[in-house]
């Protein structure tokens, strides 16, 4: 059994001064998670960073990462997430998370698809059913690498980190998605989150002996 406890976590105390001292204008890309938007002062600090990113034409990728226990309400989460989305070049989340942004589960998919008109990359994840990626006016449907999981935590972080890492190493988008999916599959079979994160060589070795399925997209 895994227990996650977050109360007065250090990352939620990020403030505007931290951003000003970080030379954001020199970054090639900014990656944020929705957790940082859940409370002050980190919410205002991150929104300030997004403003600086926009001023300096720096792409922003957001992992929605909605955790109900960190927000005062779903309505507040919807408001702040949508504000942040206006700055994003990429948005990544699962079906439940896009439901928060759109207001209902039924409208989440169409919301994601609509956002892709203004974003370079939108990934709509569906757990065991795989994912649908919207990019370059195309839809990329991918399944998962079936495994016997020990726990669900860490899958989203490993997917995103490995996806972005693969893109930076010049893998094409379809391959990068598969690498992210493989990393997620590896993490859920191990104890812990950060200690379970694989490096690229481990992911590629895993992909040599495991096949991605067609999903249910």
Which positions does each model-derived feature cover?
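Alpha-helix C-terminal capping/helix-to-coil transition sites in glycosyltransferase folds
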Residues: 25-26, 86-87, 118
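Residues that scaffold the ATP/ADP-binding catalytic core of kinase and kinase-like folds
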Residues: 3, 28, 40, 101, ...
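Structural alpha-helical scaffold elements that stabilize or flank donor/cofactor-binding regions
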Residues: 22-23, 83-84, 115
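Conserved phosphate-binding/catalytic region of the ribokinase-like
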Residues: 51, 55, 105-217
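Conserved beta-alpha-beta core of the PfkB/ribokinase-like small-molecule kinase fold
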Residues: 29, 35-110, 129-131
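Acidic, amphipathic alpha-helical patches
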Residues: 20, 81, 149
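Conserved N-terminal subdomain of the carbohydrate kinase-like
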Residues: 1-32, 203-217
């Amino acid at each position: 059994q895994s227990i996650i406890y977050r109360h007065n976590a250090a990352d939620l105390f990020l403030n505007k001064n931290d951003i000003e001292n970080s030379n954001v204008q020199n970054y090639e890309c900014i990656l944020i998670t929705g957790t940082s938007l859940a409370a002050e002062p980190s919410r205002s600090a991150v929104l300030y960073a997004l403003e600086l990113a926009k001023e300096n034409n720096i792409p922003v990728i957001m992992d929605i990462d909605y955790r109900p226990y960190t927000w005062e309400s779903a309505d507040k989460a919807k408001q702040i997430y949508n504000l942040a989305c206006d700055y994003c070049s990429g948005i990544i989340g699962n079906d439940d998370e896009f439901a928060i942004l759109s207001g209902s589960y039924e409208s989440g998919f169409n919301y994601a698809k609509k956002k892709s008109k203004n974003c370079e990359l939108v990934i709509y994840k569906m757990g065991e059913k795989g994912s649908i990626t919207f990019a370059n006016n195309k839809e990329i449907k991918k399944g998962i690498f079936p495994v016997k999981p020990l726990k669900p935590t860490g899958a989203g972080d490993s997917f995103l980190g490995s996806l972005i890492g693969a893109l930076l190493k010049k893998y094409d988008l379809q391959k990068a998605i598969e690498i992210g999916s493989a990393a997620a599959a590896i993490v859920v079979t191990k104890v812990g989150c950060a200690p379970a994160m694989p490096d690229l060589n481990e992911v590629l070795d895993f992909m040599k002996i495991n096949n991605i399925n067609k999903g249910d997209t």
